[in-house]
């Protein structure tokens, strides 16, 4: 039997949207309840990180009517800070005009657009970008040519010397949110990161995301000072600016971010975030042949692949000895297996240029078979291979990394979500905060070792229970939509317990990097099981795949590579 499952990204987090769950109808004011829950947590646990003005904002919000609160939340949730009021239409708000007036009176929003422009809070472009090109042509028929693009129109209006006239043409109310950045701060304090937002509440309300009922550690906070919060938010703004430029390959804007980067931070979470951004910027500038700037940036970071990129830039600049020195530094103290593997390839390329002899390490050659298969439907090579093995009597699962990762998540479920200090700071986490650091193992060493010993002895207590009772609950490791009861049953009945424990031990050595590179197929028959990595024409084994295959070979775990070629119709 061939069980085919496929997902979009082999390195992605588990899919938690459950298609089998019935649709849930939300109350019209669902977002008001969610926002109040957000504010309650911020006030209760993070008050020391709020300024006097921010505390006043919270108090003023509580005094608003429900309509005014909902309108403010709607505006905060929209893109931008300026809005055409007449375009706003929310059925759940009984009287939107009264709500607007209340927000103006409490200084949450302003409609004094002329004054705001004179104070240089907003520009002419900010204001008129709210309008479509046809609307602008109707407003300013003598200033705009029909052939002008909208960007050209905005430039013309921005450079027009009578802004008072331009603003006088507007006959409808415009509103601007005051202190719009507050929402970003509240979300950051609540989630402890910059990528989750109010939509997370909605996904949970709809039942599309379910989370484990773990114990939240209210005594632990990611941020300890207001300065840390402000620095994080500022760095997030820079990061957002970079990613927008990256998407359009706007290298001028990317370069403009460089002088805005903050100095190295003593607070480790912020410094990690800073170095991650620097690596991205440096890599883009390297692609744009701005080698000197890219090299200077990479030298500011310790995160991989900084040293690899330094060596490659130096090679491109024909500074071979300097590149060789970087490579040797990597080999002396590699960050991980990937970095070490890359250093060997770079050393081989550099050896002749620096008058060194390169001694190639012994390479591992995995067991392999050659298959010529028909593919009239032009399917993925993994599907063709899976169907071939199915015809040979195997039950085949095309799961790649998801098979072993899901087993690991089920086996360690209670340990992953154990109440360890500092692990959980909000109700919407897929894993503890230290999941991919060395602290994960160190803080749970006794629990993990005890579990591994139990597995080696053939005790799989809790795996089936976790599969049944935790179904659909978000866990970074368990891929519910693809990992089936049959896959679990066959794994526990066919894989020797000692081999399962060995594979978990390798995962635990480096959870971030070892969670990928596993073979495409896992197969079972009456006599045993087999891993199979499938390679089509011209496809080569990657380093992390070779390392898993070498590990399997070392420990007697059955695995092979299937090299596939496709027969032509005349050969069938």
PLM features: residue spans?
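N-terminal alpha-helical interaction modules that lie
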Residues: 19-57, 63-69, 74-281, 352-495
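Short beta-strand-loop-alpha-helix junction that forms the active-site gateway
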Residues: 79-83, 515, 526, 533-543
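Alpha-helical protein-protein interaction scaffolds
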Residues: 263-355
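Conserved catalytic cores of phosphodiester-cleaving nucleases, focusing on short active-site segments
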Residues: 483, 487, 491-503, 520-538, ...
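Nucleic-acid nuclease catalytic cores
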Residues: 524-529, 555-572
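Mg2+/Mn2+-dependent nuclease catalytic core
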Residues: 536-558, 563
């Amino acid at each position: 039997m061939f069980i085919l499952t496929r997902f979009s990204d082999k390195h992605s987090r588990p899919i938690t949207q459950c298609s089998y769950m019935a649709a849930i109808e939300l109350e019209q004011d669902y977002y008001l309840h969610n926002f109040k829950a957000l504010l309650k947590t911020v006030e209760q646990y993070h008050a020391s990180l709020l300024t006097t003005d921010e505390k006043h904002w919270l108090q003023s919000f509580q005094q608003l009517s429900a309509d005014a609160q909902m309108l403010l939340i709607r505006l905060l949730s929209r893109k931008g800070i300026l809005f055409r009021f007449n375009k706003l239409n929310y059925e759940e708000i009984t009287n939107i005009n009264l709500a607007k007036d209340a927000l103006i009176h409490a200084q949450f929003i302003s409609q004094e657009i002329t004054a705001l422009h004179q104070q240089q809070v907003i520009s002419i472009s900010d204001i008129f970008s709210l309008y479509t090109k046809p609307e602008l042509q109707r407003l300013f028929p003598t200033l705009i040519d029909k052939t002008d693009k909208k960007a050209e129109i905005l430039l013309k209006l921005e450079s027009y010397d009578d802004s008072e006239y331009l603003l006088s043409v507007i006959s409808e109310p415009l509103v601007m949110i005051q202190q719009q950045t507050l929402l970003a701060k509240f979300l950051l304090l609540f989630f402890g990161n910059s990528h989750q937002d109010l939509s997370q509440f909605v996904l949970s309300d709809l039942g599309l995301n379910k989370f484990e009922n773990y114990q939240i550690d209210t005594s632990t906070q990611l941020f300890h000072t207001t300065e840390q919060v402000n620095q994080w938010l500022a760095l997030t703004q820079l990061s957002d600016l970079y990613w927008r430029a990256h998407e359009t390959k706007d290298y001028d804007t990317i370069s403009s971010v460089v002088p805005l980067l903050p100095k190295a931070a003593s607070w480790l979470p912020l410094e990690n975030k800073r170095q991650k951004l620097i690596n991205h910027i440096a890599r883009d500038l390297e692609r744009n042949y701005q080698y000197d700037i890219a090299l200077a940036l990479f030298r500011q970071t310790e995160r991989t692949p900084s040293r690899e990129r330094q060596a490659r830039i130096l090679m491109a600049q024909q500074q071979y000895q300097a590149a060789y020195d970087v490579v040797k530094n990597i080999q002396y103290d590699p960050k991980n297996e990937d970095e070490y593997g890359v250093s060997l390839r770079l050393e081989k390329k550099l050896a002749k240029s620096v008058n060194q002899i390169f001694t190639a390490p012994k390479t591992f050659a995995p067991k392999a078979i050659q298959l010529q298969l028909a593919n009239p439907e032009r399917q993925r090579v993994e599907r063709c291979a899976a169907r071939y093995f199915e015809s040979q009597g195997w039950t085949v699962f095309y799961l790649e990394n998801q098979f072993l990762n899901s087993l690991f998540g089920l086996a360690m479920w209670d340990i992953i979500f154990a109440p360890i200090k500092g692990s959980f700071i909000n109700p919407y986490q897929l894993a503890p905060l230290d999941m991919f650091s060395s602290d994960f193992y160190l803080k749970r060493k006794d629990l993990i070792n005890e579990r591994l010993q139990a597995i080696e002895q053939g005790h799989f207590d809790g795996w089936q229970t976790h599969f049944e009772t935790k179904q659909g609950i978000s866990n970074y490791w368990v891929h519910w939509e693809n990992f089936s009861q049959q896959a679990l049953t066959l794994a526990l009945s066919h894989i020797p317990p000692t081999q399962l424990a060995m594979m978990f031990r390798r995962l635990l050595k480096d959870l971030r990097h070892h969670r990928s590179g596993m073979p495409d197929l896992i197969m079972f028959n009456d006599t045993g099981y087999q891993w199979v990595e499938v390679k089509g024409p011209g496809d080569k084994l990657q380093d992390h795949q070779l390392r898993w295959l070498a590990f399997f070979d070392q420990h007697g775990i059955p695995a092979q590579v299937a090299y596939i070629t496709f027969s032509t119709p005349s050969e069938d």
